[in-house]
Amino acid sequence: MGLPWYRVHTVVLNDPGRLIAVHLMHTALVSGWAGSMALYELAVFDPSDPILDPMWRQGLFVVPFMTRLGITKSWGGWSITGETVNDAGVWSYEGVAAAHIVLSGLFFLAAIWHWVFWDLDLFRDPRTGKPTLDLPKIFGIHLFLSGVLCFGFGAFHVTGLFGPGIWVSDPYGLTGKVQPVAPVWGAEGFDPFVPGGIASHHIAAGILGILAGLFHLSVRPPQRLYKALRMGNIETVLSSSIAAVFFAAFVVAGTMWYGSAATPIELFGPTRYQWDQGFFQQEIDRRIRSSRAENLSLSEAWSEIPQKLAFYDYIGNNPAKGGLFRAGPMDNGDGIAVGWLGHAVFKDKEGHELFVRRMPTLFETFPVVLADGEGIVRADVPFRRAESKYSIEQVGVTVEFYGGELDGVSFSDPATVKKYARRAQLGEIFESDRATLKSDGVFRSSPRGWFTFGHATFALLFFFGHIWHGARTLFRDVFAGIDPDSDAQVEFGTFQKLGDPTTRRPVV
């Protein structure tokens, strides 16, 4: 056809029948990928330990999205919360995956049908007989249908009126479960961590979409506006669609990275800011002080800390610790966590309680420094032993564990104390199995990090795509040298189509 590879999509510019065919095929590919990816993830997923080896530690990407929408059970007899399941019903993880694959096949067949039967009366202007699309009307139809879907999701699925609800948890990711959510119409609905805002915003946006769709179906655009915005050009649709997609991608990159009610930490892992701000450390400290006020011993107080909460307070679960070129799930890095050793409390020979300075997010190595409650450095692991003043040996540091597997155990051997001081830099201390997956000890990012990176990157690329196609449609006459108001048929390439009587045939 004489088109370079990067311009082959122009063959559907003035061909509504095949334009719908390629969009159907694209939807088939997206749906097929989602279903296939879900089945792959379910095949490699180990649901046996939802506390220390949750889905986000195993690198699952599409399963968390299914879970937040209300899917929690598997035909394999397990549920995401750890219970055994006898009857998962149709809408299990595998059921949803199978539905996507079946839908993909139907879209594939529809794409083939529309590719073959491209010359439909539906796409011909009865006045001129030429292929055409009433783009403003199509815009109204899409707006109306998406509004209905948006409203239905907020009013029925999220609220539990006709659906399971969504995943809701507490700020510390301990009590998460699928439950109905009532809409919140006050100012608190704008808080990104309030689940009720998800219901109310979908209801409000859906109503707006329905009204806007009806408006665009019943009111024609003014001729000046129609021409100014090139509403008759399909590339205008492409440009504005790309704008909607890149804007959405930027928004979800932000809600994922910074956290929100729609991206719960039980499904996607903690955010880096929870480590930076000592979010879980502060909650653990509050619980310990509360227990101590009830006259519990340190050992009893630490034994009451949920293992799940302690595990969040570990730098290996920070999505910013994994490099972009370190492929694989978190478990491939520091291994599969198998147990919490307990909280390490360091003391010098004078009886001062010492706190190990924690490693900041963006450091790979960090000096081991132990300070007292007032921030005065009292011990360290020196770089140059000859000049050391505060070495573990000189200061006589000991370590004792409270809670966890080493509850009540203490060590005074300097080598052992140093080992645990180094590990305490990384938060709470966990024992990991590195043998099973041949884990290399190098931190990986969680699905939260990968989602953010992917969506921010593609949003940037799509932003440039919007500028490019917007410029092409607004200044088409300048780029092509053709008057946009010209009535003459302009042929950019030779169209070769099944059943097209105008297609040139080679003379045999």
From Swiss-Prot:
<dbReference type="Pfam" id="PF00421">
    <property type="entry name" value="PSII"/>
</dbReference>
<dbReference type="GO" id="GO:0009772">
    <property type="term" value="P:photosynthetic electron transport in photosystem II"/>
</dbReference>
<dbReference type="InterPro" id="IPR017486">
    <property type="entry name" value="PSII_PsbB"/>
</dbReference>
<feature type="transmembrane region" description="Helical">
    <location>
        <begin position="101"/>
        <end position="115"/>
    </location>
</feature>
<dbReference type="InterPro" id="IPR000932">
    <property type="entry name" value="PS_antenna-like"/>
</dbReference>
<keyword id="KW-0157">Chromophore</keyword>
<feature type="transmembrane region" description="Helical">
    <location>
        <begin position="140"/>
        <end position="156"/>
    </location>
</feature>
<dbReference type="InterPro" id="IPR036001">
    <property type="entry name" value="PS_II_antenna-like_sf"/>
</dbReference>
<feature type="transmembrane region" description="Helical">
    <location>
        <begin position="203"/>
        <end position="218"/>
    </location>
</feature>
<keyword id="KW-0793">Thylakoid</keyword>
<keyword id="KW-0148">Chlorophyll</keyword>
<keyword id="KW-0150">Chloroplast</keyword>
<keyword id="KW-0604">Photosystem II</keyword>
<keyword id="KW-0472">Membrane</keyword>
<dbReference type="GO" id="GO:0009523">
    <property type="term" value="C:photosystem II"/>
</dbReference>
<dbReference type="GO" id="GO:0016168">
    <property type="term" value="F:chlorophyll binding"/>
</dbReference>
<comment type="function">
    <text>One of the components of the core complex of photosystem II (PSII). It binds chlorophyll and helps catalyze the primary light-induced photochemical processes of PSII. PSII is a light-driven water:plastoquinone oxidoreductase, using light energy to abstract electrons from H(2)O, generating O(2) and a proton gradient subsequently used for ATP formation.</text>
</comment>
<feature type="transmembrane region" description="Helical">
    <location>
        <begin position="21"/>
        <end position="36"/>
    </location>
</feature>
<comment type="similarity">
    <text>Belongs to the PsbB/PsbC family. PsbB subfamily.</text>
</comment>
<keyword id="KW-0934">Plastid</keyword>
<feature type="transmembrane region" description="Helical">
    <location>
        <begin position="237"/>
        <end position="252"/>
    </location>
</feature>
<keyword id="KW-0602">Photosynthesis</keyword>
<comment type="subunit">
    <text>PSII is composed of 1 copy each of membrane proteins PsbA, PsbB, PsbC, PsbD, PsbE, PsbF, PsbH, PsbI, PsbJ, PsbK, PsbL, PsbM, PsbT, PsbX, PsbY, PsbZ, Psb30/Ycf12, at least 3 peripheral proteins of the oxygen-evolving complex and a large number of cofactors. It forms dimeric complexes.</text>
</comment>
<dbReference type="GO" id="GO:0009535">
    <property type="term" value="C:chloroplast thylakoid membrane"/>
</dbReference>
<feature type="transmembrane region" description="Helical">
    <location>
        <begin position="457"/>
        <end position="472"/>
    </location>
</feature>
<protein>
    <recommendedName>
        <fullName>Photosystem II CP47 reaction center protein</fullName>
    </recommendedName>
</protein>
<keyword id="KW-1133">Transmembrane helix</keyword>
<dbReference type="GO" id="GO:0045156">
    <property type="term" value="F:electron transporter, transferring electrons within the cyclic electron transport pathway of photosynthesis activity"/>
</dbReference>
<keyword id="KW-0812">Transmembrane</keyword>
